[in-house]
Amino acid sequence: MEQLVNELIEANVGRVLVDEPLARYTTMKIGGPADILIVPKHVAGIEKTLQLVKKYKTKWTVIGRGSNLLVSDLGIEGVVIRLGEGLDHLEVEKHRVRVGGGYPLIKLSTLLSRQGLAGLEFASGIPGSVGGAVYMNAGAHKSDISNILSKALILFEDGTIDWLTHGEMGFSYRTSVLQTKRPGIVLEAEFQLQIGERERIVSVMQKNKDYRRETQPWNHPCAGSVFRNPTPYFAGDLIEKAGLRGYQIGGAQISEMHGNFIINTGGASAQDVLSLIALIKQTIKDKFGVEMHTEVEIIGR
C-alpha cells in the first residue's frame, strides 16, 4: 500500500490522503477511514489513478459529494476517488448544457434557472454532484435526470472512456447501468433543457426548495431518502403509519419531520443506522406485507 501511495503522489494525480476519515465527506457525518483517498484535480489524474489501482490489484470506489451514502464504521478498503473540484467545468450553449461530474447539482439548477433554462427545477433541493445524480438517476417532484440527459461521458473500470447515450444508460427508478452492469465514473454529462420564462422557472425552483425545507430535516446530518418508494405506496407514509416516527437507536433517529429520513442526532454510527434500517424493514413487512428496499447506498467494509 505504501508503494502505491508513493506512486500516486509522484504521478501528481491530485490530493492523496492516507487513512482519511470519510465522515468528513458525507452529509450523514458518518464513516470510517479510506485506506487511500484521492481528490483528483483533472481527468488525467483519475485515469492515472485507475492505472495504478489496476497495477497493484487494489479495490477502488468512487464517491461524489456524499449526499446519498452510508459509509461503514470500518471505512472503505483500497482507494476512494472523490469527485469534486477537478471535474467542475460548465459549458452552456443555448439549451444544451455540458457539465463536469463533480459540479454541485443545486448550484447548477440555480444557475440555469436564472438563465431561463427549464428542466432541472426538480433538482433545486437535491444535494450532491452531477455525477452522483446521473449514476443513481436522482429525482424529485415527479421528474428525474433521465428526463433531461442526452449522454454521459464515462470512465470505465478497464480505463476506457466513452459516451453512453440516454438509451445506453438503462435508466429506471433511481437506477442506471453504472450501478451494476457497467461500473464506471461519470466524468461529464450533457443535458438538453428547454428555453422558458425565467420568472416562472425561478418560482417553481423556490416552491420546490420551500417544500423540502418544510417537510425534510436537512438541518440535521442525513443522507436523504433512506428507502425507495414501494409502488403504489410512499415509504415515509408506511414508516409513519407503523408508529416509527422519532424512534431512535444510539445517535440515529427516524426523523420526526419525515419518516423516510434517518438523522444523525450526534455521534451516530453506521451500525446505529443499519440497525434502524433493519427494524424498519421488518416492521413494515410484518404490519403491511411490503418489502422495503434502500435508496441510500451502503458501502464499505
Swiss-Prot record:
GO MF annotations, alphabetized: FAD binding; UDP-N-acetylmuramate dehydrogenase activity
Keyword annotations: Cell cycle, Cell division, Cell shape, Cell wall biogenesis/degradation, Cytoplasm, FAD, Flavoprotein, NADP, Oxidoreductase, Peptidoglycan synthesis
InterPro entries: FAD-bd_PCMH (IPR016166), FAD-bd_PCMH-like_sf (IPR036318), FAD-bd_PCMH_sub1 (IPR016167), FAD-bd_PCMH_sub2 (IPR016169), MurB (IPR003170), MurB_C (IPR011601), MurB_C_sf (IPR036635), Oxid_FAD_bind_N (IPR006094)
Primary enzyme class: oxidoreductase
PANTHER family documented for this protein: UDP-N-ACETYLENOLPYRUVOYLGLUCOSAMINE REDUCTASE
Keyword field contains Ubl conjugation: no
Pathway: Cell wall biogenesis; peptidoglycan biosynthesis
Function summary: Cell wall formation.
Cofactor(s) the protein requires to work: FAD
A Gene Ontology BP annotation from the UniProt entry: peptidoglycan biosynthetic process
Identification of the protein by name: UDP-N-acetylenolpyruvoylglucosamine reductase 1
Family listed: Belongs to the MurB family.
Major location category of this protein: cytoplasm
Active-site residues, record numbering mapped to chain: R174, S225, E295
GO CC annotations on file: cytosol
This protein's encoding gene: murB1
E.C. number: 1.3.1.98
Domain FAD-binding PCMH-type: 29-196
Leader sequence residues: none
Localisation: Cytoplasm
Protein species of origin: Bacillus thuringiensis subsp. konkukian (strain 97-27)
Annotated Pfam families: FAD_binding_4 (PF01565), MurB_C (PF02873)
Catalytic activity: UDP-N-acetyl-alpha-D-muramate + NADP(+) = UDP-N-acetyl-3-O-(1-carboxyvinyl)-alpha-D-glucosamine + NADPH + H(+)
